[in-house]
């Protein structure tokens, strides 16, 4: 287990293998040497469908990235909150206006996002639409992560961006146990 797995388990987010997915292992590999330099993390989908802390992964990111501002977006207005270095906002990720507001208004100058995690509606259509709307505004070395992704997403994104698919192999227990990492080319 990685340090991020332990932090995720502490907050009861399903991103860690102790609860459900192995995403935190992969995130740790990407960011373990960059933790101090990450300044802005955005997550779409902050609700918790299992018992635990609403916004659990936002608290996880805040602890893992000690200098980052954390922004969460959700379609459920009843779960929005703010806390030290965490702000949350309403966003319907199927709405062009809401995604535009996410980039330009809510997080003030979206181009400096280091990590954006789509853990929102979990439909291929919303995942592809959101990625195609936001990726052009992200800086060159940003990471755009699509959690709980279907295989169809890769084919639709691969022509425009560098795409890497993470599946935990033999450990995979859930059909949604798939993470797609999208990066700008070049």
Describe each region flagged by the PLM.
Residues 1-117, 121-146, 150-186:
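A short alpha-helical cap/connector motif
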């Amino acid at each position: 287990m990685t340090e991020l797995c332990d932090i995720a388990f502490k907050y009861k987010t399903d991103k860690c293998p102790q609860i459900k997915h192995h995403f935190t292992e992969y995130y740790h590999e990407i960011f373990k040497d960059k933790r101090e330099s990450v300044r802005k993390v955005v997550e779409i989908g902050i609700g918790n469908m299992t018992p635990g802390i609403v916004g659990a992964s936002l608290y996880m990111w805040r602890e893992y990235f000690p200098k980052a501002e954390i922004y969460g977006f959700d379609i459920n207005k009843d779960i929005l909150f703010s806390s030290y270095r965490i702000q949350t906002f309403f966003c319907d990720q199927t709405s062009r206006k809401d995604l535009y507001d996410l980039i330009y208004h809510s997080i003030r100058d979206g181009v400096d996002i280091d990590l954006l995690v789509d853990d929102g509606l979990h439909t291929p259509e919303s995942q592809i639409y959101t990625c195609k709307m936001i990726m052009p505004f992200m800086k060159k070395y940003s990471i755009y992560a699509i959690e709980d992704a279907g295989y169809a997403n890769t084919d639709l994104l691969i022509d425009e961006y560098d795409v890497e698919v993470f599946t935990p192999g033999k450990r995979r227990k859930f059909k949604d146990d798939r993470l797609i990492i999208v990066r700008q080319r070049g």
